[in-house]
From Swiss-Prot:
PROSITE patterns (alphabetical): CLAUDIN
Residue intervals on the Cytoplasmic side: 1-6, 102-122, 196-261
Protein name: Claudin-18
Modified residues (Phosphoserine): S214
Entry function: Involved in alveolar fluid homeostasis via regulation of alveolar epithelial tight junction composition and therefore ion transport and solute permeability, potentially via downstream regulation of the actin cytoskeleton organization and beta-2-adrenergic signaling. Required for lung alveolarization and maintenance of the paracellular alveolar epithelial barrier. Acts to maintain epithelial progenitor cell proliferation and organ size, via regulation of YAP1 localization away from the nucleus and thereby restriction of YAP1 target gene transcription.
Native organism: Bos taurus (Bovine)
GO cellular component, one term: cell-cell junction
InterPro entries the UniProt entry points to: Claudin (IPR006187), Claudin18 (IPR003928), Claudin_CS (IPR017974), PMP22/EMP/MP20/Claudin (IPR004031)
UniProt keyword annotations, A-Z: Cell junction, Cell membrane, Membrane, Phosphoprotein, Tight junction, Transmembrane, Transmembrane helix
Regions that span the bilayer: 7-27, 81-101, 123-143, 175-195
Swiss-Prot/TrEMBL GO biological process terms: bicellular tight junction assembly; cell adhesion; cellular response to estrogen stimulus; digestive tract development; epithelial cell proliferation; epithelial fluid transport; lung alveolus development; negative regulation of bone resorption
Location of region: Disordered: 228-261
UniProt keyword Magnesium, yes or no: no
Primary gene name: CLDN18
Length: 261
């Protein structure tokens, strides 16, 4: 899968995951009344994160919001917080991912900046997906625990008679929507992180070669090549031409016709 395709697929999956998280958080059917062995069928009860509802057999539904915060169970408040954090992180990740798409050019933004933004949005999507999955799983675990506790105390035998003492609740549709939405957001974040590797520019590594100066200097002399030490001092020789004195700074004598024989 190419980098652009991987990035776009991850972006679209994250959008679907965000939409699913919002829908699941707003749904009222997080827990529904268990109708198995329930003698009362005229009333159907279900509860969500924000309110509880009662549906009559006639089709009339009445919902009542939770008017208290401190009076709610701590687990329910934790589920609320996890879902809200997941939604907020997904929204921020989408805003970052829009500018990080390779098919969109924003001024002089280079591939290195897009790679960093893609990685940032991918990490946000992964955390958001984990928050959504964790929130739904915590609520589901709370339902399972209450279900079996209710089952243990639901029937009391007295003289061979069975009496229902409390209502049991089971999984609602919102739990499955939340699990799917969290999974889509998580997969989208992973794909964004994978696309980051293709956007990052490749670094060319050059091997450093150290230069070592030679221990001896080779000086040219008219009579041929002769290795001389670098610490030798140059002497000044005086030559007399046509009766005049002339000083020469180089430490060689002019070649004669016998030097090349």
């Amino acid at each position: 899968m190419s980098t652009t395709r991987c990035q776009v697929v991850g972006f679209l999956l994250s959008i679907l995951g965000l939409a699913g998280c919002i829908v699941a958080t707003e749904m009222d059917m997080w827990s529904t009344q268990d109708l198995y062995d329930n003698p009362v069928t005229a009333v159907f009860q279900y509860e969500g994160l924000w309110r509880s509802c009662v549906q009559q057999s006639s089709g009339f539904t009445e919902c009542r919001p939770y008017l208290t915060i401190l009076g709610l169970p701590a687990m329910l408040q934790a589920v609320r917080a996890l879902m809200i954090v997941g939604i907020v992180l997904s929204v921020i990740g989408l805003l970052v991912a829009i500018f990080a798409l390779k098919c969109i050019r924003m001024g002089n933004m280079d591939d290195s900046a897009k790679a960093k933004m893609t990685l940032t949005s991918g990490i946000m999507f992964i955390i958001a997906g984990l928050c959504a999955i964790a929130g739904v799983s915590v609520f589901a675990n709370m339902l399972v625990t209450n279900f079996w506790m209710s089952t243990a105390s639901m029937f009391t035998s007295m003289g061979g008679m069975v009496q229902t003492v409390q209502t049991r609740y089971t999984f609602g549709a919102a739990l499955f929507v939340g699990w799917v939405a969290g999974g889509l957001t998580l997969i989208g974040g992973v794909l964004m992180c994978i696309a980051c590797r293709g956007l990052a520019p490749e670094e060319t590594n050059y091997k450093a070669v150290s230069y070592h100066a030679s221990g001896h200097n080779v000086a040219y002399r008219p009579g041929g090549f002769k290795a001389s030490s670098g610490f030798e001092s140059n002497t000044r020789n005086k030559k007399i031409y046509d009766g005049g004195a002339r000083t020469e700074d180089e430490g060689q004598s002019p070649p004669s016709k016998y030097d090349y024989v």
